[in-house]
Regions:
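FIC/Doc superfamily catalytic core
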Residues: 1-345, 350-526
Length: 526
């Protein structure tokens, strides 16, 4: 294999890197130096590290600048070690790098320091990503080190030892699909809140009848919201069917067959939709009105890569199921990875959000019988949701070579499978955690409090006037619409039978029952 690179030097002095401005003039190091030197066609890591010309450290959202004394040796080995030490694992960059660095050159790198922790980790990763064994001797009796640094990124709590490399494989996925999540202060703070325990406390303090009604409302609301996100307005029957599927999430193991079963439920009328894995290209976007050529916002994985990628998704779910990783940290990479792959012609978005419910339920994160209305929270945060989706899909557009087909589709011309196997899902976890927090701190307690207030109102009303439940619902609806007052129209029509004294008592009862409550949003209409 011929090594491709720009000149002899790896590092160079820059004020910006591939369109990303630097806080000051720096020398590239680690992944930036490797991407530049080997001309790797990869999405930039969310955060890069460089060497400042000054003796101070700078830490921003997209750059970590270290002092001159941290400058790595300007070699392949030097920048790889620097990357692992300061930038954690980026499997997409490493996979691309390993395609252009020969086995012979890489074997020499490992042989130069056979007992070194970084060399052993890189040796394992090289063989793990390429599927080819290197001609490298055993490192002898040395302490096994984790492949993924658990202080930098989330990995398996108990990894799998590799006696050949003297490392512990704690990667959350397999070479077929392995998105990673960095440990950030934001995620650590979200985990520390113990939102799952907060939800169980709310449920434990709620009467079973109230809880059953609240759970049913939240489940249906989530189902409707998931359709609304896709710009659809489902019939009541279709929303109920999908709500039932959401309620069963986590009860069956994942498989391609299970995804196809769920697709049939979510699509309903499949006369004009090809069910099952795509057999041609796919994209998200629009068409030029004059030429009908695609205007993609996101390009899906190639059809010939779908079987391997979906096997990877299933394997990831199995591998992390009892991995000791926080459930939300697992759910986001799985769900967003699925939607980037976009394996089906239709239904991908709703299945992607179903995967969130699947992961949380399988991990026991939500109380039994209660579904957090994550889709409803996403619908409220739709602009942020789209921004998170585009944080990875937009950079990919510049890396994917494609041409339009005669049917208005796209045909991808270059190799893209690794773009869907490996990506940084940190931003996705932070967003999903905000949505989960909303459902637990707002939706669930507000719905419970509202139903408890309604129960007080309904029970108290029977002491004023005998009224069937259907009429109580209508009276409550009118009072809610007018902030606790009955309109003249309702007073002279539907509730003309109420005396003035009864009406005064009814309005006072409504005020006493609902005073101080933050009322939940009205349910999305079907």
């Amino acid at each position: 294999m011929q090594t491709k690179h720009k000149g002899d030097r790896f590092s160079r002095v820059v004020n910006e890197f591939h369109g990303r401005e630097t806080p000051e003039r720096i020398s590239t190091g680690g992944y930036a130096a490797l991407i530049d030197h080997y001309d790797l066609k990869v999405p930039l890591p969310p955060k890069l590290t460089g060497i400042s010309e000054h003796h101070h450290r700078v830490d921003t959202d997209h750059w970590l600048l270290l002092t001159p004394r941290h400058r790595p040796e300007d070699t392949l080995a030097g920048h790889l070690e620097f990357a692992l030490k300061w930038e954690a694992l980026d499997l997409g960059v490493l996979a691309s790098l390993f395609e252009v660095v020969s086995d012979k050159e890489f074997s020499a790198l490992v042989r130069a320091e056979p007992t070194g922790a970084y060399a052993r980790r890189l040796w394992f990763l090289r063989e793990w990503l390429t599927g080819r064994q290197l001609d490298v001797p055993s490192p002898g009796k040395v302490r096994a080190v984790p492949v993924l640094d658990p202080e930098q990124q989330f990995g398996l709590a108990t990894g799998i030892p590799s006696s050949r490399h003297k490392v512990i494989d704690n990667l959350p996925g397999t070479p077929a699909f392995c998105p990673l999540v960095r440990r950030t202060a934001t995620i650590e703070a979200q985990i520390a809140k113990g939102l799952d325990h907060r939800a169980r406390k709310i449920v434990g303090n709620t009467h079973p009848d109230i809880l059953t009604r609240a759970a049913a409302f939240l489940l249906l609301d989530d189902s409707k919201a998931s359709f609304r996100i896709e710009g659809e307005q489902p019939s009541p029957q279709r929303a109920l069917r999908w709500g039932k599927a959401i309620g069963e999430a986590g009860s069956r193991p994942l498989s391609v067959a299970e995804f196809e079963r769920l697709q049939r439920i979510v699509i309903g009328d499949s006369r004009f939709t090809q069910l099952g894995l795509r057999t041609e290209g796919g994209f998200v976007g629009t068409h030029d009105r004059r030429t009908h050529e695609p205007l993609p916002m996101h390009i899906s994985a190639k059809a010939e890569d779908l079987s391997s990628l979906m096997e990877g998704v299933v394997a990831y779910d199995e591998r992390v199921r009892r991995a000791g990783i926080d459930a939300v940290v697992i759910a986001a990479p799985l769900a967003f990875g699925f939607v980037y792959i976009h394996p089906f012609e239709d239904g991908n978005g709703r299945l992607h959000r179903w995967l969130i419910h699947h992961t949380l339920a399988a991990a026991g994160y939500n109380p039994p019988g209660v579904v957090f209305p994550v889709s409803a929270a996403i619908y409220r945060e739709i602009a942020a949701y789209e921004s998170v989706l585009e944080s990875y899909s937009r950079p990919l557009l510049g890396l994917i070579e494609w041409e339009p087909t005669r049917t208005g589709n796209v045909r991808v011309l270059n190799t893209t499978v690794n773009y869907y196997r490996f990506f940084d899902a940190t931003t996705h976890v932070e967003f999903l955690y905000r949505c989960v927090e909303q459902t637990i701190e707002q939706d669930l307690p507000q719905e419970v409090a509202y139903l408890e207030a309604y129960e007080r109102f309904s029970t108290g009303l029977q002491d004023i006037v005998d009224m069937p439940e259907r009429k109580i619902d209508l009276l409550h609806k009118f009072l809610r619409q007018q902030s606790g007052r009955l309109s003249k129209r309702a007073r002279t029509n539907e509730f003309a039978a109420l005396t003035d004294e009864e009406l005064e008592r009814v309005e006072a009862l409504y005020h006493d029952s609902f005073e101080g409550l933050v009322l939940p949003r009205p349910q999305l209409e079907s």
